[in-house]
């Protein structure tokens, strides 16, 4: 194995349950995330990172790999998140499959679930590689503990294995709650103090992403008028029926399961209630600012039309922006994309530069003034039992970070 401790480090991390909690009001959202951040801080100190500190204000643990060059080069930041998605993360039992043949069905532990190339055709890309997958009962946590392990392995390489590798100052940060969309809300750009950064939070080999969705969340409250159904004619207003009518007024094909590429959508996350009152929760996504604003306006227009028909405010939407397409910031200076692209090409990795059908912590951090595109970390089928990662892809992620650092040495501030 190219980096001896990369896989053991990853396996150690994924066994810790750091599932974030969207219902929490604390930062981080769970005590487990606080404890894991402190554990990462101790690991960072053990590797030799300097100025390692945990920020109570935002749950980030930050450390520094000091420069070993007199060149005035740009300071680079590397970021990954410690939490995992909303799927069982207790008792993660990673399975290792060496020299995968690229065509066999992979059994997930003792469960009835499998990784079948017919369902997951990307498996054919991993012929001859070592895969880490789940036992079918949990997620794996490659999102984003692959990124965490890769950054730590990079730090180990620079500080302990090849300390003569020339580099400027590098700042490392691990934070909470990316999966519930609030991880970067309190990020401290001044404390991180770098010229540009990357999140190592992408998927398959070669992903290089600087364009995300713009995102909003919507909560629609429906006020009904409940009476006995036996005498309901011309009197009852069923709040659940209002919710159904509202949803049906949205464009039929603008849903996640019917869109791809640059197409945006409305996504109904949750619907509950009674005939008296109901509540629907949506997310709104689009890459283009104009279309994003049109989607939000449409949700209000539907409510206004329904209320006008009743002559009462029975449909009450609350729409809040969550994050914006970071391309608006990154495109002002594409040098950090160019350097990452060149790094991959130098390593015979084909860069995959496509819009993210989602967001990253970098979306918010970029709008705080720190351009932060996203690099591949290796995971596939993330957020569930079918998640897996290639050890060789993780190694290439470390290689890519090293090559970015090497190329950055050629750019004098």
Swiss-Prot record:
Enzyme class: hydrolase
Role description: Cleaves the N-terminal amino acid of tripeptides.
Name used for this protein in its record: Peptidase T
InterPro entries attached to this UniProt entry: ArgE/DapE_CS, Bact_exopeptidase_dim_dom, Peptidase_M20, Peptidase_M20_dimer, Peptidase_M20B
GO CC terms, sorted: cytosol
The gene coding this protein: pepT
HAMAP family (alphabetical): Aminopeptidase_M20
Domain of life: Bacteria
Organism: Lactococcus lactis subsp. hordniae
Keywords linked to the UniProt accession: Aminopeptidase, Cytoplasm, Hydrolase, Metal-binding, Metalloprotease, Protease, Zinc
EC number: 3.4.11.4
Influence of temperature on activity: Optimum temperature is slightly lower than 40 degrees Celsius.
Pfam families: M20_dimer, Peptidase_M20
Biological processes per GO annotation: peptide catabolic process; peptide metabolic process; proteolysis
Catalytic function, reaction form: Release of the N-terminal residue from a tripeptide
Cofactor: Zn(2+)
Bilayer-spanning residue ranges: none
Family of this protein: Belongs to the peptidase M20B family.
Binding annotation for Zn(2+) 1: 81, 143, 201
């Amino acid at each position: 194995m190219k980096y001896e401790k990369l896989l053991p480090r990853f396996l150690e991390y994924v066994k810790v349950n750091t599932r974030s909690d969207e219902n929490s009001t604390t930062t981080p959202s769970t005590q487990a995330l606080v404890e894991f951040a402190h554990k990462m801080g101790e690991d960072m100190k053990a590797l030799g990172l300097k100025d390692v500190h945990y920020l109570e204000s935002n749950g980030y643990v930050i450390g520094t790999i000091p420069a070993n060059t007199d060149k005035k080069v740009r300071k680079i930041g590397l970021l990954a998140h410690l939490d995992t998605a909303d799927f069982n993360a207790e008792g993660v039992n990673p399975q290792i499959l060496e020299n995968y043949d690229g065509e066999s069905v992979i059994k997930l532990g003792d469960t009835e679930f499998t990784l079948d190339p017919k369902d997951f055709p990307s498996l054919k890309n991993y012929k001859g590689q070592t895969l880490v997958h789940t036992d079918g009962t949990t997620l794996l946590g490659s999102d984003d503990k692959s990124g965490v392990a890769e950054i730590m392995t990079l730090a180990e390489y620079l500080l302990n294995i090849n300390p003569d590798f020339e580099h400027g100052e590098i700042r490392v940060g691990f934070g909470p709650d990316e999966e519930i969309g609030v991880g970067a809300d309190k990020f401290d750009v001044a404390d991180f103090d770098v010229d540009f950064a990357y999140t190592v939070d992408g998927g398959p080999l070669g992903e290089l992403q600087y364009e995300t969705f713009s995102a909003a969340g919507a909560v629609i409250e429906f006020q009904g008028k409940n009476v006995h159904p036996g005498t309901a004619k011309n009197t009852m207003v069923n709040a659940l029926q209002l919710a159904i009518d509202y949803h049906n007024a949205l464009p039929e094909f603008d849903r996640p399961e019917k869109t791809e590429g640059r197409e945006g959508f409305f996504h109904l996350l949750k619907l509950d209630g009674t005939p008296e009152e109901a509540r629907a929760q949506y997310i709104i996504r689009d890459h283009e600012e104009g279309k994003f604003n049109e989607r939000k306006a449409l949700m209000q227009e539907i409510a206004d039309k329904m209320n006008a028909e009743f002559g009462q405010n029975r449909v009450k939407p609350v729409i809040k922006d969550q994050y914006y397409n970071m391309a608006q910031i990154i495109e002002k200076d594409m040098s950090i994309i160019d350097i990452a692209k060149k790094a991959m090409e130098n390593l015979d990795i084909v860069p995959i530069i496509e819009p993210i059908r989602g967001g990253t912590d970098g979306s918010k951090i970029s709008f705080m003034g720190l351009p932060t595109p996203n690099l591949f970390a290796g995971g596939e089928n993330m957020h569930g039992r079918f998640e897996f990662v290639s050890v060789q892809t993780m190694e290439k992620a470390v290689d890519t970070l090293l090559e970015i650092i090497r190329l950055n040495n050629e750019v004098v501030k």
